[in-house]
């Protein structure tokens, strides 16, 4: 009986090994130092947009990082008023889809609609609106473009239903250390809406956010300064 059990377990192990497919990894002599997103993000379900599954989203406007990372998409959101010349440069330089910030805080009203239409024509996969934007302004943007509209949620007491009614396609949860709890609350109330969330820096926090119900994770990579510091340390050895 013991021998039979041992053989059975061995057979199951061999079956699992057969299921693991070899994935060719192509690099070149110079372009091999790719910034990798945390592997644990792959455990998320992802969000399928225009047939493309998005799981990992790099949160940066640094073109050097965008061109040298393995993320599924880019979150091009920055703490200044959106400028079309910036979005155009990022979209043109990126291998991967770009979600562009179009305002919501400092930038409001008709300007957000105009910028949203501009980035759509430039090739953005979606637009991102910041938490302070009004429902009326959100509706104007949603009616003005034919790409997903992502609304950022920064507080637990946000009226999610009102945001959805106003035209939001995807919810982006950015509540700091409370993100997993807020994601879970939203997921419990809205089982089927797409949720993007910031996962933090550690594998534990990312997995906690995914388990709470996030479909995709935004990840803030190390800065070029930090990466250069690490490289120079190796050069000094």
Task: Set out the residue ranges of the language-model regions.
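Conserved N-terminal beta1-alpha1 strand-loop-helix module at the mouth
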Residues: 7-100, 104-110, 121
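Alpha/beta catalytic cores of nucleotide-metabolism and tRNA/nucleoside-modifying enzymes
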Residues: 15-33, 45, 52, 196, ...
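Catalytic beta/alpha-barrel core
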Residues: 53-58, 73-80, 101-108, 124-134, ...
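Generic structural signal for hydrophobic
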Residues: 65-66, 90, 118-120, 141-142, ...
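Glycine-enriched alpha-helix->loop->beta-strand junction motifs that scaffold or abut catalytic
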Residues: 70-71, 94-97, 122-125, 145-148, ...
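Alpha-helix-loop-beta-strand connector modules within alpha/beta enzyme cores
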Residues: 81-105, 136-156, 178-202, 235-237
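Catalytic cores of alpha/beta
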Residues: 110-119, 158-165, 201-215, 219
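Glycine-rich phosphate-binding active-site loops on the catalytic face of alpha/beta enzymes
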Residues: 123-135, 169-182, 213-233
């Amino acid at each position: 009986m013991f021998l039979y059990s041992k053989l059975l377990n061995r057979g199951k192990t061999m079956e699992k090994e057969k299921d693991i497919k070899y994935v060719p990894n192509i690099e070149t002599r110079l372009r091999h130092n790719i910034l990798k997103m945390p592997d644990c993000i792959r455990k998320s379900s992802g969000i399928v947009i225009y047939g493309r599954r998005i799981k990992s989203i790099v949160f940066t406007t640094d073109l050097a990082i965008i061109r040298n990372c393995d993320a599924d998409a880019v979150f091009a959101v920055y703490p200044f008023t959106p400028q079309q010349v910036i979005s155009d440069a990022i979209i043109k330089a990126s291998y991967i889809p770009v979600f562009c910030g179009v305002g919501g805080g400092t930038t409001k009203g008709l300007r957000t609609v105009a910028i949203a239409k501009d980035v759509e024509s430039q090739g953005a996969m979606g637009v991102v609106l910041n938490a302070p934007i009004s429902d009326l302004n959100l509706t104007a943007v949603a009616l003005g473009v034919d790409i997903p509209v992502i609304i950022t949620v920064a507080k637990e007491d946000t009226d999610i239903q009102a945001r959805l009614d106003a035209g939001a396609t995807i919810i982006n949860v950015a509540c700091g250390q409370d993100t997993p709890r807020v994601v879970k609350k939203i997921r419990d109330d809205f089982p089927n809406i797409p949720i993007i969330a910031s996962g933090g820096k550690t594998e534990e926090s990312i997995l906690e956010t995914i388990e709470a119900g996030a479909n995709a994770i935004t990840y803030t990579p190390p800065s070029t300064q930090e990466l250069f510091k690490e490289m120079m340390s190796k050069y000094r050895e």
